[in-house]
Structure formats: C-alpha cells, structure tokens
A protein has these predicted regions:
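Walker A (P-loop) phosphate-binding motif
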Residues: 30-57
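Hydrophobic residues at beta-strand termini and immediately following loops
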Residues: 69, 160, 220
Length: 256
C-alpha cells in the first residue's frame, strides 16, 4: 500500500455543515427545547385558522414571546409552487415534495431556532396537513412519515373536526370559485368542481381521523360557537403549558 493510499484510508472523515434541524430519521420532540409548539389542524372550513388567530391575539395582549407560521408560506418555495399550480404541472408526488421543501425551509429558519430561543410557536397547519392531503392524493403514508421525520413533535395538536357537509358549505359559501388543486380536480374525482371538492375533503377527513390516537390530537368540535370554542382552547393551553416560561413583558396584561 503506497503512502497516498494509506493517508486516504486513515484521514478523518469530514463532518457536513451543521444545520439547526435534527438529523433525518430522528424526530425530536419540541419539549427538548425551551420553547413550545402549538399546532392547529383540520379540513378546510373547520374553523382552525380563526381559532388560532384568536389564540395568537390573546397571547400577544399578554406580552408573551411567540411566533406565528403557516403552511406553504416559505418565500423560497412559494413562487415555484405557484407556477406549478398555474400551469397544472404538479403530480401528487411533486406537490408533496414542494410542500416538504417549504416546510423544511421554515422549520430550519423559523420553527427550530425559535423553539431553541424559548419562544411559543403557533403553526396554522403542520406536517399532519401533508399526511392527510398527500395521502388523499395517493402518496404512501409511510413515505410521507419518513419525509417529515426531522420535524419536532408539537406540545399540543388541536384537531378541529367539523362534519363534511358543514365544512364544505362554509367554504363554498365564501368562495366565488374553487381553485383547480384546491378542489382536487387533478384526481379526476368529478368534472364538477364543487363535487370534486366535497369528495376530496371527504378523503382528507378520513385521513385526519386515522391520526387522532396515533398522533395524540386534541379533538375540538368545529361546529360550536366561536367564543365557546376559544375558551376551550385557552383552557387547554393554560393547563398543558406553563405560560410563565415565556416571560410576559413588564406592564403587559396577563391572559385570563
């Protein structure tokens, strides 16, 4: 064996550049960090975004350190997703990978650093959105789970469940026209967009229901009055998370 070959074999391995993300294949609960992660999930029209906004305002009034993030909002990926939708080029797998790239970017730049920085992170939809929607489009559930294994596990995952007809009616009554992918038209379920949307949302609802026990969802009734539902949500947050960890600013009112 010559000297050059021996040096190559004995040379120490160079570690790749470090990332703020946990290593792939090793999911790390958010409780491993000083911060806390609260997530809302549910079908379109379930009321999840409204409730998270109200919770966010309540915590902001209290002066707590928090950060809000929402699904499919990374500026790095958003334009590519938009172009793919406009040209109707997205297959279920391509769509799923774009969403995963979007989430990975936000996870590394926002979610993980803020959890490490002792912040309360509020997420309007999380990896369970991909598990439900992408599985409804035919992506293998196990493949999806592996794709997002780097994601920290939420401290609380609220699942706002509303009957299919109620949720669909809320969306249809507030939208002049459903978008192509939103309605699930790429799946060939129906030529009618409203009917395709109903069928697609039914598939998504079924996928969400499968995750209730395995992913420790806190199920809330999306049909009860907004104020009553918000009270339930706040009570669960206060009883599950020590909000004093997030140091209200001096002079700010503490949430009741």
């Amino acid at each position: 064996m010559d000297t050059q070959e021996q040096q190559q074999k004995t040379a120490p391995r160079q570690d790749p550049a470090k990332s703020t993300l946990p290593q792939p294949g090793r999911p790390v609960p958010s409780r491993a960090y000083p911060g806390a992660l609260i997530v809302v999930e549910g079908t379109d029209g379930s009321g999840k975004s409204t409730q998270l906004y109200l919770l966010k305002r309540w915590l902001e009034i209290g002066g707590y350190r928090l950060h809000f993030t929402e699904w499919n909002s990374s500026p790095l990926v958003k334009s590519a997703t938009r172009r793919g939708k406009q040209r109707r080029l997205l297959t279920p797998t391509t769509f799923s990978l774009l969403h995963a790239a979007d989430f990975a970017d936000r996870c590394e730049r926002q979610i993980m650093p803020l959890l490490q920085g002792d912040y309360l992170v509020l997420a309007d939809r999380y990896i369970y959105t991909a598990f439900a929607r992408d599985a409804a489009r035919g992506c293998p559930p196990r493949w999806l789970r592996n794709l997002y294994r780097f994601a920290p596990v939420p401290d609380i995952t609220f699942y706002f469940r509303a009957p299919l007809d109620v949720a669909v009616q809320r969306i249809l009554s507030g939208r002049p026209k459903l978008k192509y992918y939103e309605a699930g038209m790429d799946l060939g379920l129906s030529f009618d967009r409203s009917e395709s949307f109903r069928l697609f949302q039914g598939r998504i609802l079924d996928e969400y229901d499968k995750m209730v026990d395995t992913d420790n969802f806190v199920v809330l009734d999306g049909t009860i009055p907004v104020n009553k539902l918000q009270k339930q949500m706040r009570h669960i947050v206060k009883s599950s998370i020590d909000l004093s960890r997030f140091a209200p600013k001096k002079g700010a009112r503490k949430p009741r």
